[in-house]
Each structure stands twice: as C-alpha cells, then as structure tokens.
Amino acid sequence: MTAEVDYTIDELMAVCIARQVVDGEVLAQGLATPLVVAGYILAQATHAPNVAFASAIGQGLCYDWSPLGVATIEELWLGNSVLHTGFVAAVADMLPRLHLKEFFRPGQVDVEGNFNNVAFGKNYERPRMRLPGTGGIPDVTTFSDKIYLYVPRHSRVTFVKELDFVSGLGHSEKRTRGVGVRYLISDLGQFDWANGRMRLTSYHRGVDMKRIQAKTGFELEIAPDVHETPPPTLEELRLLREEIDPLNVRRLETLGGTARRNLMREILEAEGAL
C-alpha cells in the first residue's frame, strides 16, 4: 500500500496551476500573486522547461527565476528580465501578440465566468469594499483564449449569482472574440466551463461535493467523470518547499488576519527586512 502524501492546500493549488501549463507558453502574472508564480516556476522546473514569464512588475519578460520573496520580489523580475515595456505596450502589443496565459484572482465570479475586481457593493462612489482594480483585465478578457482563474478561499462571497461590477468577460453573449474563462482552481476543487457554465471537474482530498455546492452562490454543473484531485508528487513538493518557495510566500494568499500578518513578519525577518 502506498503511503498518503502529506501536503497543504497552497501546495496542492500551486501544483494544479503548474499542471495547466503547456511547454513553450508565455505566462503572465499580476501583482501580489505568489501562488500563481510558484505554480509557473514549478511547471518550468518539471514538464515545461521552455516557458517564459511576463510580469506586471516592470512589465518584464524573462526565462529565469529566483526563489519567491516579499522584500526581494522585484529582484526576481527586474533582475532576470531580458526586456521591459511600458504598461500600455504590454497590454496593447505584448499580450495580443504572444497569446499569454494568465491566472486572475477574482473578487466575484458568476456562473458564466464573468468576474469583478472593482468593488463590492452597487454604489461605485461608496462601495462596501474597494477591490484592487482591473488593470488590463477588461482588455485581455475580451480577446484572449487563455484566461484562467484561482480562488484561494472558496465562499459564497466570491461565487455569486450576480456581480456588483463586471471587469472580466466570461462566457457572455456579448463576446465577439476569444473563448472565455477555461479553468478555475479553488481550495475546494477544480472547475471548467465546458458548456459555458461553471462545472466541477474534481474535488480536493477531504472535500465532498455537497460542501462545494453549499459554498457556491449558484447551481454548479457536475462533470460526468468528476473525481478526487490527484495529489502532488514527492518531487513537486520537494521543489516547492526547498527550491522555489522555502519561505512559504505562496501561503500568504490562503491566509487572513493574524495568521497572515504573522507569516508576513516571519518572511520579512528571514529576508532581513525587519
């Protein structure tokens, strides 16, 4: 009998992100998305050695990587980049030409894969909470065929019947180009939009489908071959823990409150920034 592999949810999510990467792709990542970056680097270190990384930090393109950090994150992208562009050139020129794959973290997402990163609340002038903003999301999601999403904390706050605002275009009748969101990974399972509606394709270890539905604000479709998410391999875990992210920066995206603050302090102390 094979022993059960011990892993954390952030490690599983990073591995699932890595497994969505195809060798030769250009991978885009926004600001403060270490879970995605860990997955991208893991893909290059395993099955996709020929990927390139495009970062919102400095609008740079690079082929090499450094271990994840907080105080040192700019060094990862600015120090390894082979070129830098301005933001407008990155959105209007680089993104359409290179057909980048990108994982976005939505504040809200609906059954069709439309998503909101503007604000919570219908009143834009006085929202309940102002979100990070759209960046290039409204542009990219109207034409790209490689839009992917990730949600570190699956809840009915994020998965809603109706968005407060729309910043990312999903499987909408208004779409004239692109195919809409292809895939979503959360801390509960993996999903696709094979029929234009969000569909559960796998559930993580220890999670049942009733719990996933209860934490989703609309009715989910279920894939005929729905199954448990395959676990990380020992080598994938070793790479994440020892080489790619020994400081556990990726875990910041799964935590909140005191736990997140404490981990942030640990990371900054380890980097010598405090």
Tell me what each language-model feature is.
Residues 32, 54, 128, 227-228, ...:
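Residue-level detector of alpha-helical recognition elements and their boundaries
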Residues 67-232:
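Conserved phosphate- and dinucleotide-binding cores of soluble alpha/beta proteins
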Residues 224-274:
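A conserved C-terminal secondary-structure "cap"
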Residues 57-64, 82-87, 135-138, 252-269:
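Short, surface-exposed, charge-dense and proline/glycine-enriched linear segments
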Residues 2-80:
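N-terminal active-site beta-alpha-beta segment that forms phosphate/nucleotide-binding
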Residues 51-52, 140, 244-247:
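Short, intrinsically disordered/low-complexity patches at protein termini
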